[in-house]
Amino acid sequence: MKTHYNLRVIAARAVAQVLDQGQSLGALLPPLQAPLSEKDRALLQELCFGIMRVLPQLEWLLRQLMAKPLTGKQRPVHYLLMVGLYQLTYTRIPPHAALAETVEGAVAMKRPQFKGLINGVLRQFQRQQPALLADAERQDIRHLHPSWLQKRILAAWPAQYAQIIDANNQRPPMWLRVNRLHHSRDAYLALLAGTDIAAVAHSQLPDAIRLEMPCNVGRLPGFDRGWVTVQDASAQGCALLLAPQNSETILDLCAAPGGKTTHILEIAPAARVMAVDVDGQRAARIHDNLQRLGMQAEVVIGDGRTPDAWRSGMLFDRILLDAPCSATGVIRRHPDIKWLRRDGDIAELAELQRQILCAAWRVLKLGGTLLYATCSILPEENRGQIAAFLADHPDALLQETGDAAAPGLQCLPVPTSGDGFFYAKMIKETQAC
């Protein structure tokens, strides 16, 4: 990338790659951010994630401001206009600077003939902004979710629907997990206070701290030395519920990027841990996290559906299966999920989960424990999945983790607490039938 760049164009192109090519921001942004200054890295993330969060509103605004949509080869200008509207509505960038940089983006895109159009549309929005935004709040798009997902959430959680939608549309809190092998949580809170980082302890999770304001990990005391890890509170519940012991052989299945693997080793540093993921690039991040925390585990690239291909005959005392899922519990953290997922994906994911769960059960020792987890809030992937599994596996004894009337524990996203997550803990009682 050249030294001189137009950040608005980079953002517009990233948005296009998500919406037109189905790529995720999590994969797209790191290489785009690498050559940028810290300030511009943060701004690029704000623009891209923010646009994904409020996409229906921006699309609606453009329909009001333009006589006809930009299509075909003009589509990149459509996304550049989105970047302009987002800056004017949701950032503290001075309007004149936001407008000037966005207009100049047309030149950087080699579409200078659109400078006048971009300038005119954004200035018209500035004049009509209060009325347009008020009108947008009266439209169906105000929920900022695709209709299929709204219907599924409403059907599953009618009483909590508004809370879930609201939480999904907010910026996520930043949670830390203190490495108990280095510091107590209270000691680390004192270190944060000494660097003017305000934080509060979780009321139930022993290692969890929430920052009052998110910050760059470079500001966190001892981050590079493995004193602390960024991990949502709900995700921290996985290793705690698994309750690993030092003498055990433990499988972390679908383990990338390794946050739960390292948490297992913080709780049981003498355990033998195998971390398996089907994606080689994501598995490399497990190595990175282990190295940062000074830990060792056997990292394997393998398909959870075919454990005989990689387990070398091993059976496991405990298995953590953080199953691939719709990620509907972490939309606030990954708002592009709303536009990457399709209604038909849910049944396909549920079948994949079933296959991995059944395969994992086969390599669990008698008397062993399996914790099934997802970051979904949809019953087909969670309680429905576990109910079907229990019906097919009489050797599976469900451990009570939540509501006794339904299998498993379902957490919903809460603005100042954890993401949406599901857990079901099962013990293998007898020989399989």
UniProtKB/Swiss-Prot annotation:
It is found in: Cytoplasm. Disulfide bonds: none annotated. S-adenosyl-L-methionine binds at C254, A255, A256, P257, G258, G259, K260, D277, D303, D322. Its EC number is 2.1.1.176. Coiled coil: none annotated. One of its GO terms (biological process) is rRNA base methylation. Gene3D superfamilies: Helix hairpin bin (1.10.287.730), NusB-like (1.10.940.10), Sun protein, domain 3 (3.30.70.1170), Vaccinia Virus protein VP39 (3.40.50.150). It comes from the Bacteria. It catalyses: cytidine(967) in 16S rRNA + S-adenosyl-L-methionine = 5-methylcytidine(967) in 16S rRNA + S-adenosyl-L-homocysteine + H(+). The active site is at C375 (nucleophile). One of its GO terms (molecular function) is rRNA (cytosine-C5-)-methyltransferase activity. Its main location: cytoplasm. Keywords: Cytoplasm, Methyltransferase, RNA-binding, rRNA processing, S-adenosyl-L-methionine, Transferase. GO terms for cellular component: cytosol. The keyword Signal does not apply. PANTHER family: NOL1_NOP2_SUN FAMILY PROTEIN _ ANTITERMINATION NUSB DOMAIN-CONTAINING PROTEIN, NOP2 YEAST -RELATED NOL1/NOP2/FMU SUN DOMAIN-CONTAINING. Specifically methylates the cytosine at position 967 (m5C967) of 16S rRNA. HAMAP family: 16SrRNA_methyltr_B (MF_01856). Belongs to the class I-like SAM-binding methyltransferase superfamily. RsmB/NOP family. This is Ribosomal RNA small subunit methyltransferase B. It comes from Sodalis glossinidius (strain morsitans).
